Amino acid sequence: MLEHILSLGAYLFCIGIFGLITSRNMVRALMCLELIFNAVNINLITFSNSFDTQQAKGEIFAIFIIAIAAAEAAIGLAIVLAIYRNKNSTRIDQFNLLKW
Amino acid sequence: MELELDLSFFYKTTILPECVLIFCLISILILDLILKIKDKNVFFFISLVSLLLSIFILIFQLKEEPVISFLGNFQADNFNKIFRIFIALCSILCIPLSIDFIKCTKLAITEFLIFLLTATIGGMFLCGANDLITIFVSLECLSLCSYLLSGYTKKDVRSNEAVMKYLLIGGTSSSILAYGFSWLYGLSGGEFQLQKIADGLVSTEMYNSFGSLLALVFIIVGIGFKLSLVPFHQWTPDVYEGSPTPVVAFLSVASKIAGLALLVRLFNIVFPFLPNQWHSLLEISAICSMILGNLVAITQTSMKRMLAYSSISQIGYLMIGLVTGNFDGYTSMIVYLLFYIFMNLGTFACIILFGLRTGTDNIRDYSGLILKDPLLTFSLALCLLSLGGIPPLSGFFGKLYLFWCAWKTGLYFLVFIGLFTSVISIYYYLKIIKLLITTENKEVTSYVQSYTVSSFSLLSKNSIEVSIIICVIASIFLGIFMNPIINILQINLHLNTFTNI
């Protein structure tokens, strides 16, 4: 049972990384970031259920990660708004001012 | 219940420096809210005083024994305290740089100070964090504030682009780090404190397994992004070019100090069984950083981009001390870090001053600056030469000690690469200095012509110039007083059991 859930976590992690690399929209990239954090949460809660049923430190870490991911998403969306005001689009590939 | 009260009395002094900063933060917020103060310089004064106060508290605490407080979540030993002093020192030097910049660009001052102080607090907690939750939360406290700071000029499209890249890459790196932490948690059988994780890895006999190697790789990738080690450096030049320059100056030193402290503590405590693996991984990335950072810096045309690559190569030099892995290695790393703070912040201060007066940061536009402002030219040249490592300046002594320690432990290849790339770095630093000084065809660029010199009398200095002068004096003369600094460090670190592992 443990390895199935761990592979689910690894699968979600890979989807998140893949989505971050390929997605062309800022909002979609933020959603992929959330996906990676959720993969971490799945891992933590699984481990906590199997090894650490007394203190449940994994669940506590998961709560912290959820809160921080929310803060990060809030900052990300604020940046999306600022970008949209300046350029009228949120596509990542249109940002090519800064390069070599 | 009584026991907890007693313990909480003990806790107060361990995080007293951070508490001073938090108190200052709250008082700035409240003062700005209730009093309609027109002269915002009061806030700079408050924050500078509180940072100085926290440095003094930390220096006085250096004599105390190492303690682990907050039920094992926070460790205060001398190694951490030195790094916490360095981070507070960076903020002290960076705040004067930002005063004039913010006044010229007409941004909000209070929010800038609050973000900067919060980033400082996050970095200071990160240096002393002793379990995975505290490490993650304080790391995010540092990086979330860095995102906000680097997107501070929100009307500027370049700043928008920089913060977008920084947020996506920083978020990815911290999630990768958290994934590595989750594996550590599982492999150690449900432990969170660093020392208990190491014990747990032994008791579950997982310390040499594939899983712990995987966790090690994930953690190196996550911290490598923060430190901008070479395979993970792609974001650095873009973020440095787009962000406001005082913010770049802060990021280029503070995040590196915090990241290095985290790297040293985490790997020495949690992975003492895999020293060969993490040493070789870090050695490869150090070599790549030195070579690629210095080679690419030659071709750059923007000053900030050039400094970004130069900072990538400097983190490679700092890694030499970490890879050396013994007491001398860590001491040399700390000494070089101290010199690096002054050299790098001095260079950035000169660039901020030039950028404010002319509005450009292209290397080409610096030509013939000596005709207009000899003192600025002189200080920029000295800081750059010190970064490159020219003999009488402090950067030379720092590098020499670093290479000597590595040579003694037998890392000949690393030292050879370091020496070779230092020569390359001297080439591109000298190219800028040549551009600054030579006036062969007697024509200066329009930017330099529009440069207006303030009177350099002793009374009417602006804050950037004060900061420049401190940094230049430190980066010239600190090298001469290197022996006392090393002695102080060795005496203080000697009491500490951690680096002797």
Curated annotation (Swiss-Prot), chain A:
Gene3D superfamilies: 1.10.287.3510
GO cellular component terms attached to this protein's record: chloroplast thylakoid membrane; NADH dehydrogenase complex
Compartments it resides in: Plastid, Chloroplast thylakoid membrane
A GO biological-process term: photosynthesis, light reaction
Membrane topology, from the record: Multi-pass membrane protein
Gene Ontology molecular-function annotations: oxidoreductase activity, acting on NAD(P)H, quinone or similar compound as acceptor; quinone binding
Keyword ATP-binding: no
EC number from the UniProt entry: 7.1.1.-
Entry superkingdom: Eukaryota
Keywords from the named record: Chloroplast, Membrane, NAD, NADP, Plastid, Plastoquinone, Quinone, Thylakoid, Translocase, Transmembrane, Transmembrane helix, Transport
Catalytic activity: a plastoquinone + NADH + (n+1) H(+)(in) = a plastoquinol + NAD(+) + n H(+)(out); a plastoquinone + NADPH + (n+1) H(+)(in) = a plastoquinol + NADP(+) + n H(+)(out)
Record field: transmembrane: 1-21, 29-49, 60-80
HAMAP family recorded: NDH1_NuoK
NCBIfam families: PRK05715.1-2, PRK05715.1-4, PRK05715.1-5
Function according to Swiss-Prot or TrEMBL: NDH shuttles electrons from NAD(P)H:plastoquinone, via FMN and iron-sulfur (Fe-S) centers, to quinones in the photosynthetic chain and possibly in a chloroplast respiratory chain. The immediate electron acceptor for the enzyme in this species is believed to be plastoquinone. Couples the redox reaction to proton translocation, and thus conserves the redox energy in a proton gradient.
Subunit structure: NDH is composed of at least 16 different subunits, 5 of which are encoded in the nucleus.
Protein family (similarity comment): Belongs to the complex I subunit 4L family.
Protein name (record): NAD(P)H-quinone oxidoreductase subunit 4L, chloroplastic
Organism per entry: Physcomitrium patens
Gene (name only): ndhE
Swiss-Prot record, chain B:
Enzyme Commission no: 7.1.1.-
Keyword Thylakoid assigned: yes
Domain of life, per lineage: Eukaryota
Organism name: Physcomitrium patens (Spreading-leaved earth moss)
Subunit structure, interactors included: NDH is composed of at least 16 different subunits, 5 of which are encoded in the nucleus.
Known function: NDH shuttles electrons from NAD(P)H:plastoquinone, via FMN and iron-sulfur (Fe-S) centers, to quinones in the photosynthetic chain and possibly in a chloroplast respiratory chain. The immediate electron acceptor for the enzyme in this species is believed to be plastoquinone. Couples the redox reaction to proton translocation, and thus conserves the redox energy in a proton gradient.
Enzyme class: translocase
Gene designation: ndhB
Cellular compartments per GO CC: chloroplast thylakoid membrane
Gene Ontology biological process terms from the UniProt entry: ATP synthesis coupled electron transport; photosynthesis, light reaction
Molecular function, one GO term: NADH dehydrogenase (ubiquinone) activity
HAMAP family (UniProt xref): NDH1_NuoN_1
UniProt xrefs under NCBIfam families: NDH_I_N, PRK02504.1
Protein family (similarity comment): Belongs to the complex I subunit 2 family.
Keywords: Chloroplast, Membrane, NAD, NADP, Plastid, Plastoquinone, Quinone, Thylakoid, Translocase, Transmembrane, Transmembrane helix, Transport
Subcellular location: Plastid, Chloroplast thylakoid membrane
Transmembrane stretches, start-end: 15-35, 42-62, 82-102, 107-127, 132-152, 167-187, 210-230, 244-264, 278-298, 307-327, 334-354, 378-398, 410-430, 466-486
Protein name: NAD(P)H-quinone oxidoreductase subunit 2, chloroplastic
Reaction catalysed by this enzyme: a plastoquinone + NADH + (n+1) H(+)(in) = a plastoquinol + NAD(+) + n H(+)(out); a plastoquinone + NADPH + (n+1) H(+)(in) = a plastoquinol + NADP(+) + n H(+)(out)
Membrane topology type: Multi-pass membrane protein
